[in-house]
Structure formats: structure tokens, C-alpha cells
């Protein structure tokens, strides 16, 4: 008989075969990697290509309001970048989340209005992935801290609106953030999320 109480296992010797089997299983339990350990060991260093995910590891973004943490994957290659206007000048878009670039991008791209940067991101199909988006300003801040060398010089658009006429942008070379006129053409670089 096997009894489990308060995480303690008691084996009775009534069936030596069953007792030996359970004892062998329990003996190897400490050596077996947990699912979390196995997932963590597969995470490449920040800035390295993440095989099968379509780009480079941009770092771990903390979830907001109890939401799950996620890894930012930074798109690679010529088709992952563009120079575009943010769009929607003199419009209050509602894309004001400073942390949820995915929601901002979807809102802008599906609005039926002209938002070139968000539409570029929303339509992207890169490395077999179709969930690319324009990062929110806090996601840009994380990328600026972790992998500034992976960005070209100059300001890049975020998906976060600042006001009716301005949107947030990030300078990865110097780490500064500011706002620019939505009609201005700036760099765009796509990201996606990976939850583990």
C-alpha cells in the first residue's frame, strides 16, 4: 500500500514489486528537471537569435496588473523595418497604452483610418509569424536598455499616442524618449511576444 500525506510517501511491503517500482520513481524525482527549468534552459541570451521565434531575444517584459510576463522578440531583416509616418494627425485614437503595443497596434490598424506604421506592423508576415506589432513606449524602453545596438540610429515610433497631434518615440542610441508629430516619417521596428 502507498500512502501520501503532507507530501510524505509511506510504502508498505505487502507488494514488493510495487514498492520497488514506486521507490525507483521517487529516487529519480529530485534529478528530473521541472517543466519550468526545461523552458528556462531553452531561452537564448538577450540579443541572440531565438530559433523558431522569428527574431532576437529583446528581454523579459513584466506583465501589468497581474498579467503574465512575456519575452519580446525583435524582428530581423530588411522587411522588419520601415520609415513611415505614424498617421492620424489631429485624431484622438485611443491607442494610449504605454505598455500594450499589441493592443495599440490592433486598434490603429483596424480603425479604418490611415495609420501607416501600425498597418505595416499589423500586416507583417515574417519568419512564419503573423503576430508582429509596433511596441508601446515602455516596451521600447526595455529594448533600449537591453539591445540598443540592434537598432539603427535615430528615433523610432512606438504605438503609444501622446496627444491628438503627437506620438511617443524612442531613440535607441542615446536612450531618450520624446514625442513627435504624427505626420513625421520615422523608423519602425517590429516585435512580437512569447509567453513561457
Regions found by a protein language model. Name each.
Residues 1-19, 129-131, 137-196:
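C-terminal, surface-exposed recognition/capping segments
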Residues 114-115, 136-138:
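Mixed-charge, polar/low-complexity N-terminal
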Amino acid at each position: 500500500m502507498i500512502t501520501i500525506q503532507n507530501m510524505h510517501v509511506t510504502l508498505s511491503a505487502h507488494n514488493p514489486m510495487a514498492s520497488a517500482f514506486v521507490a525507483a520513481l521517487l529516487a529519480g524525482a529530485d534529478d528530473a528537471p521541472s517543466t519550468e527549468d526545461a523552458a528556462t534552459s531553452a531561452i537564448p541570451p538577450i540579443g541572440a537569435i531565438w530559433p523558431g521565434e522569428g527574431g532576437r531575444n529583446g528581454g523579459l517584459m513584466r506583465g501589468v496588473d497581474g498579467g503574465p510576463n512575456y519575452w519580446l522578440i525583435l524582428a530581423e531583416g530588411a522587411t522588419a523595418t520601415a520609415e513611415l509616418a505614424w498617421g492620424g494627425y489631429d485624431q484622438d485614437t485611443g491607442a494610449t497604452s504605454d505598455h500594450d503595443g499589441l493592443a495599440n497596434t490592433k486598434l490603429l490598424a483596424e480603425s479604418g483610418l490611415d495609420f501607416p506604421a501600425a498597418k505595416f506592423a499589423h500586416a507583417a508576415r515574417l519568419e512564419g509569424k503573423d503576430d508582429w506589432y509596433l511596441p508601446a513606449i515602455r516596451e521600447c524602453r526595455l529594448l533600449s536598455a537591453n539591445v540598443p545596438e540592434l537598432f539603427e540610429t535615430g528615433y523610432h515610433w512606438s504605438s503609444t499616442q501622446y496627444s491628438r497631434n503627437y506620438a511617443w518615440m524612442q531613440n535607441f542610441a542615446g536612450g531618450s524618449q520624446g514625442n513627435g508629430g504624427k505626420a513625421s516619417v520615422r523608423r519602425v521596428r517590429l516585435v512580437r511576444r512569447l509567453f513561457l
